[in-house]
Regions:
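A phosphate-binding catalytic loop at a beta-strand-loop-alpha-helix junction
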Residues: 146-160
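Glycine-rich phosphate-binding loops at beta-strand->alpha-helix junctions
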Residues: 76-86
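Charged helix-capping and loop-helix junction motifs
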Residues: 86-92
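Hydrophobic alpha-helical packing residues
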Residues: 94, 98, 164-165
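A short, conserved beta-to-alpha structural element at the edge of catalytic cores
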Residues: 158-185
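A structural signal for isolated positions on well-ordered beta-strands in alpha/beta enzyme cores
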Residues: 71, 145, 172-175
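Active-site-facing substrate-recognition patch
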Residues: 1-71, 108-140, 179-182
Length: 185
């Protein structure tokens, strides 16, 4: 079961631009192969212009001129280096295109710590997770749109949105490059 606070975040508006089929899913079309490549390229910092254009178009369509009062903030990647490669130029470009306030510099990944996760077979598994530091004063009282590259169940997005709201922000919803799918229709 999903925590009530996380569900509250998942109930907010979400947009995603393509389907992502994990590499182990083989019988996918050329379109899905191209989408998978776009996801990988974006994660490696290469396809940010195309994704920034789509993201900006979605924000402008949904929020119009009020984009100038919205903070754009991505769910941080697993390390500070990956976060910079994936999001620094991307966030700057989305904010140039929309007039939104760039939240990139107000969140940082400062290291890793161990956590225990229960997996599908109910076995306990120890994983490293990133420690995220926030510029609390910056987010207090702000409307925020959260971005993440891929949404599967939405727990990373919902957890991050909750963290922002605990600082006094109002998360409006999430935008995602892709949504994970496992069955090819």
């Amino acid at each position: 079961t999903i925590d009530i606070e996380l569900q509250k975040q998942l109930d907010k508006p979400q947009a995603w631009f393509c389907k992502y089929f994990p590499a182990r899913i083989r019988n996918v079309s050329e379109r899905e192969i191209a989408d998978r490549k776009l996801v990988f390229d974006f994660k490696d910092g290469r396809a940010y212009e195309e994704v920034a254009q789509r993201t900006a178009a979605n924000m402008t369509e949904r929020y119009g001129t009020s984009c100038t009062n919205i903070v754009f903030s991505p769910v941080p990647a697993s390390t500070d280096k990956k976060n910079e490669i994936r999001y620094k130029a991307f966030c700057q470009r989305v904010c140039e295109l929309t007039g939104a306030i760039n939240g990139y510099d107000h969140v940082s990944v400062s290291g890793e710590r161990l956590t225990i996760h229960e997996n599908r077979k109910a076995e306990k598994e120890v994983r490293k997770v990133n420690v995220i530091e926030f510029d609390s004063a910056f987010f207090n009282g702000r409307a925020v749109v959260v971005f993440d590259d891929v949404i599967t169940k939405g727990l990373s997005y919902a957890t991050y949105a909750n963290q922002l709201e605990s600082l006094g922000a109002n998360v409006l919803g999430g935008i995602f490059l892709a949504r994970t799918h496992y069955k090819v229709k």
